[in-house]
Amino acid sequence: MTDRSFLDWPFFEPAHRELALSLDAWATENLCDIDDSDVDAACRELVRRLAAGGWLDYCVPAAFGGAREKLDVRSLCLIREILARHSGLADFAFAMQGLGSGPITLKGSDAIRRDYLPAVRRGQKIAAFALSEPEAGSDVAALAATARRDGKD
């Protein structure tokens, strides 16, 4: 990483600076030999490597083996920025683990959290966030569907 001046921005803590430098060094060593001719296989391999490197620990809270007590947006942004500089596919693989685990962390039942979050962190399950609606596609902010309770269930 040639320009590190952004790490001096006031909203980054020393731990964020250490994270950025450590990930950049790791990515230089671990992302240079990914064969992306088979994108699905490459993504699975990237998730495996990200888990082995401890980077997926940032996708889940500490209660499920994660790096921090709560998900930290600054850490997630730094990780994505650095991974994207090294490999767009590595950024994609990391982003999907985070996008899929975020809603489970925030609103999942205890049983779902116990089942999925540790496995996502270890790279044993590939997380996803999927939705679609006519006129909105995958734009969450444009969703128009509503729900209303009908009965006691």
Across the structure, where does each feature detected by a protein language model lie?
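Short secondary-structure junction/hinge motifs that connect adjacent elements
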Residues: 28-54, 64-68
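Extended amphipathic alpha-helical segments enriched in small hydrophobics
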Residues: 19-23
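Residue-level recognition of alpha-helical structural elements
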Residues: 12, 39-43, 112-113
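Internal helix-loop-helix
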Residues: 52-124
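Hydrophobic alpha-helical scaffolding
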Residues: 13, 36-37, 69, 106
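Intrinsic disorder at enzyme termini
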Residues: 1-18
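Short loop/turn motifs at secondary-structure junctions and domain boundaries
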Residues: 2-3, 39, 136-139
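Glycine-rich, Trp-frequent "lid" loop and neighboring beta-strands that shape
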Residues: 66-69, 111-153
